């Protein structure tokens, strides 16, 4: 790994420099840096009942009035040729997508040959277009049958279920796929009840205990998948995608700085400590013990996790958070959500210096620099930006979408990444979220992220026509120029 980092840094230095910042800034991105875009299966594919696909847990969720479900989504399943042609026109070096677990294993146990066919075709078309496939094994989509049978991730049997999926993919695509993402945002899976598949009536300490059991099983499964991946595909690179939210102390009060640190420990560091070091941090163990959350840790399991760290860390970056200390002299459970205050530790507050998106997400491009630096300095692994984007209401005017707000967001974040490369941080690539408009988990088609507009809304499928947004042409130019103007 040290050799990789040294070679990477030397390549950066040789690329040419300019000096418009406090450090020497590179002119262009490295030749092997991958400019990509990302989607996930359940949000983009559609074809929910075709080719033997089984029921996934998100399909049991009660439909919200005015928000579409995932049954058709962007209908990528039936627009494959057109969508790959658009990727090629955009100039992508890489495309990150996920596998629908229930296409491959409809009941979680039995392989479905028809389910592979879509991915066979997609991967072949990507390779023909000189686009590197980046495959996410598990992105929120979990077989309902496994939850019904024994609680899914709450049972240790779930580890073998995941490994069956992973092994089938490694064997099938071992000559075609080099880059693998083992799991997407595990922290979100265990904190959002419908992504874990348990009853929404379970709450408080009972839910926290369940979440920790599931989290433990996922970490074992991911470690074993790392081992299998290297055994089946010796040249492969595999790692998880996490969602860091770097914390800014709201004031110069040292208590706020400590609270900000503790927010990050509970947000993502506890999970990366498990992935990369095979251990629970003292802070996290004390946090659980104070809340009477009992962990039954098996020494052999921890040895497996420690022996099989990832090759890289995927970073899904969207926002920072601003933190003040919460001085209440009591302990409470934070509830079932990803972003919430924690009584006795911290509160999340608005930052007057940081703009917010339509959905109240802080827009802080410097946060991606903080994430890259903190993660590398703590874990010393190469990184890939696996998601980054702006969700917004997009309007079609005279057949065009002028999404300058998205261009500004992406430009600021890519500029920060360019600075990080100049500082020598090993970043493999960047995948914007998203390639194409897709169904957002809570806002449906109201919240759009894509470079490509899909002509549908929450109530009307319309014609699902693809329309290139202004940001499409902007990103196309960024890629062709290797980011020279960023």
Question: Residue ranges of each PLM-predicted region?
Answer:
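Active-site-adjacent substrate/metal-binding segments within catalytic domains
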Residues: 45-119
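Low-complexity, intrinsically disordered or signal/transmembrane-proximal segments
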Residues: 9-11
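Acidic, Ala/Val/Gly-enriched low-complexity intrinsically disordered segments
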Residues: 2-5
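Active-site region of glycoside hydrolase catalytic domains
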Residues: 20-64, 108-109, 117-486
């Amino acid at each position: 790994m040290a050799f990789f980092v040294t070679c990477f840094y030397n390549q950066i230095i040789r690329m040419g420099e300019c000096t418009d910042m406090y450090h020497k800034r590179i002119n262009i991105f490295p030749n092997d840096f991958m400019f990509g875009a990302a989607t996930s299966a359940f949000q983009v594919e559609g074809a929910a009942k075709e080719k033997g696909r089984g029921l996934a847990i998100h399909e049991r969720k009660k439909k919200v009035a005015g928000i579409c479900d995932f049954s058709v989504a962007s209908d990528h399943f039936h627009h494959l040729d057109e969508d790959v042609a658009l990727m090629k026109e955009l100039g992508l070096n890489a495309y990150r997508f996920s596998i629908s677990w229930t296409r491959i294993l409809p009941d979680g146990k039995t392989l479905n040959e028809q389910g592979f066919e879509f991915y066979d075709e997609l991967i072949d078309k990507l390779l023909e277009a000189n686009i590197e496939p980046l495959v996410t094994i598990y992105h929120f989509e979990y077989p309902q049958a496994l939850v019904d049978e024994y609680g899914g991730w709450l049972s240790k049997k779930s580890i073998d279920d995941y490994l069956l999926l992973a092994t089938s993919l490694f064997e099938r695509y071992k000559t075609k796929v080099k880059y693998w993402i083992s799991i997407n945002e595990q922290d979100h899976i265990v904190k959002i009840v419908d992504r874990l598949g348990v009853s929404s009536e379970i709450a408080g300490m009972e839910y926290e205990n369940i979440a920790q059991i599931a989290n433990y099983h996922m970490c074992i499964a991911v470690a074993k998948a790392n081992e299998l991946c290297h055994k089946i595909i010796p040249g492969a690179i595999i790692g998880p995608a996490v969602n860091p939210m770097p914390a800014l102390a709201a004031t110069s009060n040292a208590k706020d700085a400590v609270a900000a640190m503790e927010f990050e420990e509970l947000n993502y560091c506890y999970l990366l400590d498990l992935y990369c070091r095979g251990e629970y941090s003292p802070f996290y163990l004390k946090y659980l013990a104070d809340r009477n959350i009992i962990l039954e840790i098996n020494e052999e399991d921890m040895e497996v996790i420690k022996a099989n760290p990832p090759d890289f860390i995927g970073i899904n970056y969207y926002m920072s958070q601003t933190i003040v200390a919460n001085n209440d002299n009591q302990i409470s459970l934070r509830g079932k959500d990803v972003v919430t205050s924690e009584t006795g530790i911290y509160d999340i507050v608005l930052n007057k210096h940081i703009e917010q998106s339509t959905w109240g997400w802080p827009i802080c491009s410097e946060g991606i620099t903080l994430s890259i630096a903190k993660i590398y300095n703590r874990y010393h692994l190469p990184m890939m930006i696996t998601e980054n984007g702006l969700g917004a209401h997009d309007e079609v005017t005279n057949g065009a979408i002028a999404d300058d707000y998205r261009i500004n967001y992406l430009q600021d974040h890519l500029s920060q990444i360019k600075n990080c490369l100049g500082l020598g941080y090993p970043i493999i690539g960047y995948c914007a979220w998203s390639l194409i408009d897709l169904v957002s988990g809570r806002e449906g088609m109201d919240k759009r992220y894509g470079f490509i507009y899909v002509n549908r809304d929450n109530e009307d499928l319309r014609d699902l026509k693809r329309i290139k947004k202004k940001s499409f042409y902007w990103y196309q130019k960024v890629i062709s120029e290797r980011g020279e103007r960023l």
